[in-house]
Amino acid sequence: MKGKFIVIEGLEGAGKSSAHQSVVRVLHELGIQDVVFTREPGGTPLAEKLRHLIKHETEEPVTDKAELLMLYAARIQLVENVIKPALMQGKWVVGDRHDMSSQAYQGGGRQLDPHFMLTLKETVLGNFEPDLTIYLDIDPSVGLARARGRGELDRIEQMDLDFFHRTRARYLELVKDNPKAVVINAEQSIELVQADIESAVKNWWKSNEK
């Protein structure tokens, strides 16, 4: 049996780490024990090097297009070398971010050309996409306050609030048009967020059960 690919998306401070735990817990309840966890950017030796370049200040300014191209280079390394092989082996993959992050952060936040974004996505990924995307929706000011509480912010997390409002707006546009995506209110208590995630995964499982 071919595995499934579930992705968790959201702004900084939305609670993706605890959401991952909730998803894995539900999958175990449903009898899915062989689960692979991935993160973007990262997940392979080359992708992790690109992650460092993307998230940290460098000697020269990183242009918006260069940032996007590095993200896609890291993404395709992960997809081809980790995600697809795992799925073909019947394993389930739970990802911390995937392509929707680029569409929201670089397409919405950075305001890169939509045609350029779409062309790059189709060229690199083709029709590969998650089976389920869980988007954790949170007001940027709330999420950033949580992120700051964790310590030092990376290069992207240091962007101004308007950047994250644009990113959130684009996320909401993307999930509205995506039948394979669900929205979770991430401003609730962690218990309610976990309950909503578990319910969403179980409902998705029932609707896709063969």
From Swiss-Prot:
Entries under PROSITE patterns matching the protein: THYMIDYLATE_KINASE (PS01331)
InterPro entries named in the record: P-loop_NTPase, Thymidylate_kin-like_dom, Thymidylate_kin_CS, Thymidylate_kinase
Protein name: Thymidylate kinase
Its job: Phosphorylation of dTMP to form dTDP in both de novo and salvage pathways of dTTP synthesis.
Keyword GTP-binding: no
BP term (GO), one: dTTP biosynthetic process
Enzyme Commission code(s) on record: 2.7.4.9
One Pfam family here: Thymidylate_kin
GO molecular function: ATP binding; dTMP kinase activity
Organism: Haemophilus influenzae (strain ATCC 51907 / DSM 11121 / KW20 / Rd)
Gene: tmk
Top-level taxon: Bacteria
Keyword Plastid: no
Reaction(s) the record says it catalyses: dTMP + ATP = dTDP + ADP
Keyword tags: ATP-binding, Kinase, Nucleotide biosynthesis, Nucleotide-binding, Transferase
Residues that hold ATP according to the record: G10, L11, E12, G13, A14, G15, K16, S17
Transmembrane segments: none
Cellular component terms per the entry's GO annotation: cytoplasm; cytosol
Similarity comment text for this entry: Belongs to the thymidylate kinase family.
Gene3D superfamilies from the UniProt entry: P-loop containing nucleotide triphosphate hydrolases
